[in-house]
């Protein structure tokens, strides 16, 4: 079967030799290749006839579109006999413009490969004028000859008419058969595989015509095939202006009565087709019923739907409809419910190389339904299809556990496996109200009309079964295993804050709800026992917990604090007067803290390592602050000491506010700012000195640890050096700006 469009160019004797007489001229078919790469058949005139013409058997069908005007070209159709009922072709011919009114006799045949072979052609004079177009046809030895009349034309432009393979004149008018203008596949058309059960009843009758039905009148789920649905498709609307409207006649229907049923066809010629429009690809397809062909004209504006369409068009029609298409296998007789809604757009349905047109307004293809907040709600909708038994989806829905929705923002949901023997994939589920669950629905044609109802579940998004097809297409993700479908959702909140009112259970089966409640209750009890028995854990358990924490936070190295001693010349400066007064009390407090730390267990030391890393960074910043204090005391930068406020920690600033609360007198804004910054410098130096006094004890404590002492990283040192240089440059620039401000102030 082929859908290639073959164009035949007819060159008359006038074009070849300049003679005005073309009577008795025969044509020879020469296959060529056009400029666009398509195969063409060129007819060249020959001087003599190669044989006698077969007499014409009158079987006229009158067309009243010309109304006696002999200068109007007509759209005609010739019929060819095909050797196989599953193959046909369509040919596009230009309208001939001879000098005289001529009757052309064309006799053609088509072999199984789909290539046109014109066996004999001839011309004869016809007495003008004519008032009607006559059509004749006869079948002799699997050959059909079609006679049509073409009036002369004085127009210079080239007109075209399309010669289609006729189709059936029987009662085949339905929503699945194309009629009217051709179809266009837009660029945004979607090609997706769907099951045949949600499709309209007429389409199911075509697809599921040979599928065996049970005694109850329903089709088993194991017999439901998969089809490919292309949507949307648009009808081509051609606007005809006044100049060309009188050229084309009204639609003419040609029918034959002497053709056997396996090749009897019917074609409607569409009125208003513009001659300059792009030729329409006529793709021939056959329905499931043998001997009933149908033409589906398609003009694609997108390469992807066109390629997919042509791929299924080229497939040969199989005798058994279920062969070559994987079916959905089930093992039980449980029922599931579906909802079908009217289709909004036209669509093409492809199944085993066959094409059906699905008109909009018919019922089928389940849509997304707005879910309710209740546990389940019944929504009855009328549908022309009956529910089919699908045990697989029902079994999956029973095994999938509902997620726990917690309204508090502080709660965090995470998934864990139900047991060691049934692992489940880890997934973080967000408790959003807008998330819904889409469940597949299965239904088939039935003479009874029932009201459908479904249970609407508001859960997190879960993808259910998606069968994979042998053609390379699949409906979505792979089908998950049964063990992975069982998920245990456990929240990481405290056991004391979780109550049954904050958890909403939504599922179809009460047994599943009870199972989920028992799992959550067990988890709460475990957390409660763990909370009240923390003091009884051994060092081994603490070491295990430490290893887990380090793994969670990505800590791969041991944390160390490197301390250096403060220079001696700083102790003689005026900035350490307050430190000398508070040195004894601060040192006592530090000793108390160190003794308490020493009494702590081994696990407490290890848990405090992240905090010690923060102390290391804090102390390095304080060292930089002490360097700047030296520069300030030396007189290099007095006015720019405000920079220290951004370096000191927040806790030091808070303590500084407490220390300076005794100040009752206030100077102007500038003097107050300098005073505060000066005291902040003193506080920073105080913290640095306290750390330096404790350096010996810290070094001793860390050497007693089981981990070796490692120097600070090189990258940190380089980074700190760069920061120090940048701050130095900033201080110099600010000093220069301050000098400029002073000069400007003096000038004013």
UniProtKB/Swiss-Prot annotation:
InterPro entries on file: LRIF1 (IPR026191)
Any Gene Ontology biological process: dosage compensation by inactivation of X chromosome
Origin: domain of life: Eukaryota
GO cellular component terms, A-Z: Barr body; chromosome, telomeric region; nuclear matrix
Chain span(s) of sequence motif Nuclear localization signal: 604-607, 618-621
Chain positions of cross-link Glycyl lysine isopeptide (Lys-Gly) (interchain with G-Cter in SUMO2): 436, 583, 680
Coiled-coil residues: 715-748
UniProt GO molecular function: nuclear retinoic acid receptor binding
Location of the region described as Disordered in the Swiss-Prot/TrEMBL record: 416-436
Keywords linked to the UniProt accession: Chromosome, Coiled coil, Isopeptide bond, Nucleus, Phosphoprotein, Transcription, Transcription regulation, Ubl conjugation
Cellular location(s): Chromosome; Nucleus matrix
Summary of subunit composition and partner proteins: Interacts with RARA. Interacts with SMCHD1; leading to recruitment to inactivated chromosome X in females. Interacts (via PxVxL motif) with HP1 (CBX1/HP1-beta, CBX3/HP1-gamma and CBX5/HP1-alpha).
Role summary: Together with SMCHD1, involved in chromosome X inactivation in females by promoting the compaction of heterochromatin. Also able to repress the ligand-induced transcriptional activity of retinoic acid receptor alpha (RARA), possibly through direct recruitment of histone deacetylases.
Domain notes: The Pro-Xaa-Val-Xaa-Leu (PxVxL) motif mediates interaction with HP1 (CBX1/HP1-beta, CBX3/HP1-gamma and CBX5/HP1-alpha).
Protein's name according to its UniProt entry: Ligand-dependent nuclear receptor-interacting factor 1
């Amino acid at each position: 079967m082929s859908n290639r469009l073959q164009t035949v160019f007819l060159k008359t004797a006038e074009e070849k030799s300049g003679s005005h007489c073309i009577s008795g001229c025969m044509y020879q078919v020469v296959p060529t290749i056009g400029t666009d790469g398509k195969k063409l058949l060129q007819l060249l005139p020959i001087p003599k006839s190669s044989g006698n013409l077969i007499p014409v058997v009158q079987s006229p069908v009158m067309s009243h579109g010309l109304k006696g005007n002999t200068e109007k070209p007509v759209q005609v159709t010739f019929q060819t006999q095909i050797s196989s009922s599953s193959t046909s072709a369509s040919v596009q011919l230009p309208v001939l413009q001879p000098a005289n009114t001529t009757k052309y006799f064309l006799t053609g045949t088509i072999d199984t490969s789909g290539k046109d072979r014109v066996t004999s052609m001839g011309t004869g004079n016809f007495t003008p004028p004519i008032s009607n177009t006559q059509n004749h046809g006869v079948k002799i030895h699997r050959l059909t000859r079609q006679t049509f009349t073409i009036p002369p034309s004085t127009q210079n432009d080239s007109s075209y008419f399309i010669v289609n393979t006729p189709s059936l004149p029987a009662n085949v008018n339905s929503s699945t058969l194309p009629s009217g203008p051709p179809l266009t596949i837009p660029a945004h058309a979607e090609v997706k595989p769907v099951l045949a059960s949600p499709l309209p009843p007429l389409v199911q009758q075509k697809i599921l015509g040979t599928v065996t039905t049970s005694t109850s009148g329903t089709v088993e789920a194991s017999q439901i095939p998969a089809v490919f649905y292309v949507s949307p498709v648009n009808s081509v609307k051609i606007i005809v202006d006044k100049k060309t409207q009188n050229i084309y006649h009204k639609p003419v229907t040609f029918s034959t009565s002497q053709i056997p049923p396996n090749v009897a066809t019917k074609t409607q010629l569409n009125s208003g087709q513009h001659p300059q429009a792009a030729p329409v690809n006529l793709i021939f397809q056959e329905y499931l019923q043998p001997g009933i062909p149908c033409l589906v004209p398609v003009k694609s504006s997108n390469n992807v739907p066109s390629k997919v369409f042509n791929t299924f068009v080229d497939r040969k029609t199989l005798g058994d409809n279920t062969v070559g298409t994987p079916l959905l296998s089930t093992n039980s007789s449980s029922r599931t419910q579906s909802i079908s809604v009217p289709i909004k757009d036209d669509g093409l349905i492809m199944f085993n190389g066959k094409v059906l047109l699905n008109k909009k307004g018919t019922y089928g293809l389940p849509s997304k339904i707005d879910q309710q907040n209740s546990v389940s709600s019944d929504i009855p909708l009328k549908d022309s299809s009956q529910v089919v038994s699908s045990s697989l989806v029902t079994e999956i829905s029973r095994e999938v556990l509902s997620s726990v929705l917690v309204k508090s923002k502080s709660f965090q949901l995470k998934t864990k496996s139900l047991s060691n023997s049934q692992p489940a994939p880890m997934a973080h589920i967000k408790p959003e109200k807008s998330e819904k669950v889409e469940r597949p629905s299965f239904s088939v044609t039935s003479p009874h009309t029932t009201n459908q109802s479904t249970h609407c579940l508001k859960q997190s998004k879960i993808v259910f079964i998606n069968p994979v097809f042998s053609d390379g297409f699949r409906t979505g993700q792979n089908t998950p295993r049964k063990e992975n479908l069982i998920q245990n959702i456990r929240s990481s909140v405290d056991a004391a804050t979780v109550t049954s009112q904050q958890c909403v259970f939504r599922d179809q089966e009460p047994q599943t709800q009870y199972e989920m409640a028992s799992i959550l209750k067990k988890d709460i009890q475990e957390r409660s026992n763990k909370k009240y028995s923390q003091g009884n854990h051994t060092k081994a358990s603490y070491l295990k917990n430490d290893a887990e924490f380090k793994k969670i936070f990505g800590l791969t190295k041991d944390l160390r604090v490197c301390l250096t001693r403060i220079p001696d010349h700083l102790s003689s400066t005026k900035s350490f007067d307050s430190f000398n007064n508070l040195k004894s009390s601060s040192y006592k407090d530090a000793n108390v803290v160190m003794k308490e730390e020493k009494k702590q267990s081994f696990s407490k030391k290890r848990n405090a390592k992240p905090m010690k890393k923060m102390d290391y960074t804090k102390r390095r910043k304080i060292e930089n602050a002490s360097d700047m204090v030296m520069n300030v005391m030396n007189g290099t930068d007095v006015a720019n000491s405000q920079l220290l406020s951004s370096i000191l920690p927040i806790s030091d600033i808070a303590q500084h506010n407490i220390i300076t609360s005794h100040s009752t007198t206030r100077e102007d804004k500038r003097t107050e700012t300098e005073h505060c910054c000066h005291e902040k410098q003193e506080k920073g130096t105080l913290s640095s000195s306290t750390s330096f006094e404790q350096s010996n004890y810290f070094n001793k404590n860390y050497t007693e640890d089981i981990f070796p002492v490692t120097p600070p990283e090189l990258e940190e040192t380089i980074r700190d050096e760069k920061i120090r240089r940048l701050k130095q440059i900033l201080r110099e620039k600010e000093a220069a700006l301050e000098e400029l401000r002073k000069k400007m102030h003096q000038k004013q």
